[in-house]
Amino acid sequence: MVPATPVLQGRRLRLRRITPADVATLTAIRAEAAVRRWWGVPRAGDFEPPEDGDLLAIDVDGAVAGAIQFEEVTDPMYRHAGVDIFLGAAWHGRGLGREAVAVLVRYLFEQRGHHRLTIDPAVANEPAIRCYAAVGFAPVGVLRRYERVDDRAWHDNLLMELLAEEWQGGRADGP
């Protein structure tokens, strides 16, 4: 288990530990068709932090807009982390996903000492790919038939990465 992540403050949002009071909202967000398409049906335990990372609520003025998580390899020979995020449909199109990813990227590079971050959206999830590219992630390959979600068919995912030396120090922390 990694140390608890502190509250991470962005310009319009904060990333904080999920509380039991957040679970109903996050379950409802995950059940929305626009989110379920990429994440599948919510299951028990989905809102527990991973053993080798953390799961954080995306809090906008006290409202839970979604969640963002990271899983890390802490072996000093590797020091990298993977990131995932979902936002409720009502929050789409406002730049909040980009800001949340940028805030977490800053933390993972500056505080956790990672040298490489990855994210792997479905190749058909063009808004997510644009969001991650705006933060600085670049495509490096396609993970063929990588995952199955709501429709149970295999889908390709785009592997994107961001290296610490390529990161522009929070260029996308806000709108």
Question: What are the roles of these predicted feature ranges?
Answer:
Residues 110-120:
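Conserved GNAT acetyl-CoA-binding A-motif
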Residues 1-48, 165-175:
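A short, well-structured alpha-helix characteristic of acyl/acetyltransferase catalytic modules
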Residues 18, 87, 121:
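Hydrophobic adenine-recognition pocket in adenosine-nucleotide-binding enzymes
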Residues 118-121, 138-155:
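Conserved catalytic-core motifs of GNAT/GCN5-like acyltransferases
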Residues 98, 123-141:
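Conserved active-site alpha-helix within GNAT-family acetyltransferase domains
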Residues 91, 95-104:
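Conserved acetyl-CoA pyrophosphate-binding loop and the N-cap/start of the following alpha-helix
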Residues 37-92, 107, 163-167, 174-175:
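Acetyl-CoA-dependent GNAT
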Residues 63-66, 127, 154:
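Glycine-rich acetyl-CoA-binding "A-motif" of GNAT/NAT acetyltransferases
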